[in-house]
Structures are given as C-alpha cells and as structure tokens.
Amino acid sequence: MAKMTVRGLEDKIAELEALSIQAPEIIRRTLYEGAGVVADNMRQAIQGIPTDNRIGTPENPVYGIQPLQKKGLEESFGITPMKHENDGYNVLIGFDGYNGIRTKKYPGGQPNQLIARSVERGTSFRRAYPFIKKTVRSSKAAAQKKMLETYEEEVNKIMK
C-alpha cells in the first residue's frame, strides 16, 4: 500500500484561520481605500462647481451655487462608518448636515444633500451641473484597482 506524507499542512491551516479572523479588518481597509479614491476626486469636483451670487429665475437660471453653499458642501462631504448588511459590507460617501444660509423655510441652514442634488440635477431656477455621477463614473476603475492592491497586500501579510 502506498504512503503519502504531507508537510506544512498545519501551517497553511493556521494561515487560513488567521485570514478568516482578520477578514473584517481586511474588508474595512479595502473598502476605505477605494472610497478614499472616489472621495478625493469628489472633493476636487466640488471645488470645480461654479459660484454665482445671483438669484435664479425660470427665465434666467443660475449656473452655479453661492460661495457659502459651496463651502457647506466641501465641509459636509465625507465617508460613513462601515456597515455589515445582508448582502455584505458597505461604506457610503456623501453630504451631511446644513450650510450657513438660513432662510424662513430652513432656519437651521439649508440641507447640504438638497443643495448637492439641486446642483447635480438642476431646478427651475438652477441649470444642472452633474458633478457627482461624472466623478463616480470616472473614479470607478481607479478605486477598484486601489481596493485590489490593498486586498492583495493585506492577504499577503498573513499568507506568507
């Protein structure tokens, strides 16, 4: 009868166990690296939004936002904490909070998400300046590449 001896199997099993224990941290680092690429590009896109102090009308819409609205977008943009959901792990990038322009309708300031959406899609008094969709689309490949590099680097640290 033939005999076979396998050496190093215990080491491989230990590496795989270490990998499974550290998987959430590897996923977190990978997701944040990819989101960071998109977020950096989005910050540049926000800086590129034209400013306009005029008040738009349907007959004469503005093409841009007020400087204080732009400042609110710049300051409120960020990445959410990682969440584990049914279909996997997610991080989101977006706008939060309110800018400093207080109105009768918004005494606490205008919602930054509302301003970003109105710039992206346009309104009856503002022409669209689609910066979000364009930035996400152009950043996708670089973000995926960075995520793959980070993942491989983290796995290679464990699987020596």
Locate each region found by the language model.
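N-terminal, Lys/Arg- and Ser/Thr-rich interaction peptides
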Residues: 1-25
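Generic secondary-structure boundary/loop-capping signal
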Residues: 1-3, 16, 65, 74, ...
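Short amphipathic alpha-helical segments with heptad-repeat character
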Residues: 17, 21-32, 133, 137, ...
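Lipid-handling modules and contact-site tethers
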Residues: 113-160
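Short, low-complexity, charged/polar segments at coil/turn and helix-coil boundaries
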Residues: 21-122, 159-160
